[in-house]
Structure formats: structure tokens, C-alpha cells
Amino acid sequence: FPQLVAGPIVRASEFIPQLYQPYALTKERAGLAVFWILNGLLKKLVLADYLAVQFIDRVFDNPQLYSGFETMSALFGYSMQVYADFSGYTDVAIGIAMLLGFTLPKNFNSPYKASSVAEFWRRWHLSLSTWLRDYLYIPLGGNRTGSIASYLIVFLFLVMIALVVDQPLLSVLLGVLFAGGYLLMRYSTTAERWVNTNINLMLTMILGGLWHG
């Protein structure tokens, strides 16, 4: 504490020097900290919990009582619930840390604005994605293009993320699906990109929820 278990993940080189800095809390910094905390609580208590209790849990508990449209809406809604819950939690952590004199990195950057699976992971859980990129993806050669090994590394990278977020049973399947979506966008031609972008918008929303479901 104040760096909490679920993130943001802070590297020692960034956090330890802050332990030796004199404590200083300006009015502007205090106001920003309160904003982060209230924003996180709003996401968690108002958006995530309300969606879960009033709609999503009801559909998932008794799907036979609902239409296909309602079930699909619940699936997309669950993606939003996961985002609001997780990002709300880390927003509160950032705000509390700021009140205590520490600066933690931003952990989400509007991930559901992404137009592809690759962009989704550049926006989702930034501290985890960056850590895995620097210590797993790049050292294994994932930034090389066009080789079979690079495809396998993309798959391994996404499976590792699934394992980190505690989804071992779905990790392999979702690793395949995410890697497939990533490679589809990465290697498609210009003529195909418009179609693939719209497919990936839907794929990103659905898999984003399933990954944490």
C-alpha cells in the first residue's frame, strides 16, 4: 500500500525513488487525487455494480428467460462492467497514492475505443501489457515480423496475460482467438482493412468481456 495488488503495476525504478522524496501535497494535487478517487468510485459503485445487479447477473443466471438480443446485450454489457470495475479500482488506487505523495501510472486508456485487438491491449491494463512487452514479448523476438516464431510469440504473450488474470481454463482458447484477431488486422491488405476493422470492433468488445469472465 498505496500500490495495490491488482494494479497499477509499478516498476522498482519508478517507485522506490519516490520513497525518499519529501512529502508534498499541493491544493492542485489534492484536488486531482479526489477526482481520481471519485471517478473510480463512480465507475465501480454506480456503473459496474448497477449493471451487474440490475441486468447482467439476471440474464446470465437465467438466460432461457431472455431473448437473443437481451443475451447479446448482456454480453456486451459485461465487457463494460469488467472495464468499469477494474479501471475504477485502479483509479481509486491512483488517487489514494497521490494523497500519500506517490505517483502511479495511468492503467487504462479508453480500451473500448480500440478498433483492433492489438490496439485494445495497448489501451487495457497498460502497466501489465507494458511489463509483458518489455520482459517477454520483445526479448523472445515478438517485434520481428513475418516469421512463424513471431506468430507463436503473439499467442504466448496473450496466453500469459490470461494466466496472470487467473483464467487458466479459457487462456488457450482465448489466446488463439485474440492472436487470430491481432494477426488478421496486422497482415490484412488495405482493401480488407475496413471490413476487418468493423469485425474487430465487435471482437474486441466480446473477447474483452470473456477474457475476464
Report residues per predicted region.
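Membrane-embedded transmembrane alpha-helical bundles that form the catalytic cores
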Residues: 1-213
